């Protein structure tokens, strides 16, 4: 089985996640057997020391010894965590991030996950109340970023691997923390699955079938959603929800979930998706609701839904631009201002006026091309600027005299010049990562 899986890959570079336990040990020896028949195959191993057990260093030394014995290059890395909650999940994420950093572009990561692991994962997903996507469990092949992970033992039981290890007298280690039933996975492994297997010997195989069915259903659903959502994603990657009130609630929630999945973050819970629908999609047009997901916000503006990274408040920041021959860096990755011939045309400052940039403005103003003063809030709305971006636009001041929102508008002033000289202009460009929408004449990150 494993040989058939390995031989289907043209690139013959493999990195084995090697803990020293029986599963990864069988994987290591199986790969050595395959390499004997296919010398072009190149194998490396990586061992992650979690530093959770007094014997952690001995296990690391064991892995090094075995790899040296069979002339397999090995990488060893230590990871530490400070959190005491969600230890299993935190370690898993940190372990994969570490492995990813050492995985070569053309290299395939091999792990020793087996059918029992798949069943445990299924039960953990059931405990969390997961839907079909979560119940899909692990797949034999998937991608970590752009790099491939393969689990060649996923259809094999733990007993089958133990039998092979015993028949071939393999040296492996036993992590006794795997027997600590305070951990959810261990509780399922030692207290739940043995009883189910005793009652129904075919139970593990049927668990695998369930994950396959859920994966197929998820894939089919995503094909439908991908086709449908292409017409709903705007130029700035926001989601057009104008017609959501005319669409079935379940379809709306599925579209929201799929849209969020494109952001490469951990998928929010069912409850969170429900909140997004009820509190944002179904809210009044003039409301400004938001849902926080980790370090991001889901917000609505007019007929679109936005996924925004939470940023620091810079509304009280003042920047003085003393030397306009040099560019002025703006905070929070907002780019920079530069004087050039391609920029926004502005009246030049008077002598002794200090050029400064701010990010907050209140009250009424009169802009060039208008006859009446209007509240700044109304002007932002006219320019289609959502509330969370209004304190991100550089505002040009000469001393305390407001001149312009760079790239948007200029203040209308009555210029009294006793010497009747023509007022000079200069040009400023705001170089940034903002997308300009000429049709709706503004910008979203």
From Swiss-Prot:
Q: What is its main location?
A: cytoplasm
- The answer on whether this UniProt entry bears the keyword Transmembrane helix reads no
Top EC category: ligase
The GO molecular function terms of this record are: ATP binding; tRNA(Ile)-lysidine synthase activity
Q: Does the record carry Transmembrane as a key word?
A: no
Give the function comment from the record. Ligates lysine onto the cytidine present at position 34 of the AUA codon-specific tRNA(Ile) that contains the anticodon CAU, in an ATP-dependent manner. Cytidine is converted to lysidine, thus changing the amino acid specificity of the tRNA from methionine to isoleucine.
Stated name of the protein: tRNA(Ile)-lysidine synthase
Source organism of the structure: Buchnera aphidicola subsp. Schizaphis graminum (strain Sg)
